A protein has these predicted regions:
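Thiol-based oxidoreductase modules, predominantly thioredoxin-like and allied folds used
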Residues: 5, 28-42
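Non-catalytic, surface beta->alpha helical segment in thiol-disulfide oxidoreductase systems
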Residues: 55-81
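Hydrophobic residues in alpha-helical membrane-spanning segments
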Residues: 12, 29-32, 53
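Secondary-structure boundary motif
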Residues: 25-29, 77-80
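Local sequence-structure signature of Cys/Sec-based thiol-disulfide redox active-site neighborhoods
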Residues: 1-26
């Protein structure tokens, strides 16, 4: 599962949301969760030290917003392995 951690104070917050929406359209089969750390019930793993953070399992894929093509290529590689 890809989990994307974000918060409203993050300068890239709007871009993160657009990127996640595009990803959901392009890879509808991909388990995906957008975690808004502003929500009181949101759980932040200790290894998430900034936002946005893109996490596959317990592995950080990107800290900061990647280019859409880079994100898609990385996810395709992970799903194929």
């Amino acid at each position: 599962m890809l989990r994307v951690f974000t918060a409203s104070h993050c300068p890239g917050h709007s871009r993160t949301r657009r990127l996640v929406a595009a990803l959901a359209r392009q890879r509808p089969h991909l388990p995906l969760e957008l975690v808004d750390l502003d929500e009181p019930e949101a759980e932040r793993p200790s290894f998430v030290i900034g936002t946005p953070t893109f996490v596959w399992g317990n592995r950080i894929l990107f800290l900061g917003n990647p280019a859409e093509g880079d994100l898609l290529a990385r996810l395709d590689a992970l799903e194929g392995s």
